[in-house]
Design a protein with these regions (language model features):
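Core catalytic lobe of class I
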Residues: 1-231, 264-279
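S-adenosyl-L-methionine
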Residues: 233-274
Length: 279
């Protein structure tokens, strides 16, 4: 893998479907982090030297009614610590200021903020972190053709390679924690080259994979929830029919109990506009 762009569950902050082994249903925060660490270890294993893990995540704010006091679990910081322990190099993050949708992040924004217009209220939670983790071992050496096909305009470069982004949050009607296609597209273009392979181990509704498709990258998505797998498959098939007549879509179901792959038309495991396959 040349690049990983993903957004893991925000612990149990959001309501995910009842799916076996769903990380978002783990009640103990430390147990959740241990399970998440297993994913990052596999990500580190499959990344090429110099490849990046880009992780979109927000801290977990809990209300007084849940813990007896207002509390923030610093998920972004804990992920950085875990990744450094695995062997990643921590790089500067991007701060994503979510122009809309922020009240959803605290489950009930109006009650979480405390008494209005009085001192000691709780700071509004309207930002997320785009964490940058790099696997050591060298720098990419793409071909001249890849470089030319992957160039970013000066205007976009100056705008994207800043530490604060102002992008509206995506609708939560279809998925409880989506991120905008614009955000995924920027990240794919910033940290990969045309014909590279991009992985999303928490692919949800397939936003990262669509961004990869539209920018000429291969993509692999993994999702545990059958409903979101079907959603991804529909979106990717639509992209394939409208944009990439020569693309190859591989739709597979992974039977974890039997540890083998089962073909199933309605479940998405891998999609790619070119020729590469996950080893």
């Amino acid at each position: 893998m040349h690049l990983v762009v993903t957004s893991p569950p925000y612990w149990n902050l959001k309501r995910y479907n009842e799916t076996p082994d769903q990380l978002g249903h783990i009640q103990d925060y430390e147990s959740f982090l241990r399970e998440l660490e297993k994913v990052w270890k596999h990500v580190y294993r499959v990344l090429v030297p110099g490849g990046r893990l880009v992780c979109v995540v927000g801290d977990v704010c809990v209300a007084r009614r849940d813990f007896g006091r207002h509390l923030v679990f610093p998920l972004h910081a804990d992920i950085c610590v875990i990744c450094r322990r695995i062997g990643f190099d921590n790089l500067n993050p991007i701060i994503w200021h979510k122009i809309a949708n922020a009240s959803y992040e605290v489950a009930n924004g109006s009650k979480f903020l405390g008494k209005p217009y009085e001192p000691n209220a709780i700071i509004k939670n309207d930002m997320e972190f785009i964490l940058m983790q790099r696997k050591p071992g060298g720098y990419r050496k793409p071909s001249d053709a890849q470089r030319d096909a992957s160039r970013i305009s000066k205007e976009d470069f100056d705008h994207w390679f800043q530490q604060i982004w102002n992008i509206p949050g995506a609708s939560t009607k279809q998925h409880p924690a989506p991120f905008p296609l614009e955000l995924a597209t920027r990240l794919v273009r910033m940290f990969s080259f045309v014909d590279d392979t991009v992985l999303d181990p928490f692919c949800g509704s397939g936003t990262t994979m669509i961004a990869a498709f539209r920018t000429g990258r291969n993509s692999i998505g993994i999702e545990i929830d059958p409903e979101y797998c079907q959603m991804s498959a529909r979106y990717l098939k639509a992209e394939n029919s409208s944009l990439f007549s020569n693309a190859k879509l591989l739709l597979e179901k992974v039977d974890t109990a039997e540890a083998h792959l089962v073909q199933e038309d309605q479940v998405i495991y891998e999609a790619r506009p070119a020729k590469k396959k996950l080893e």
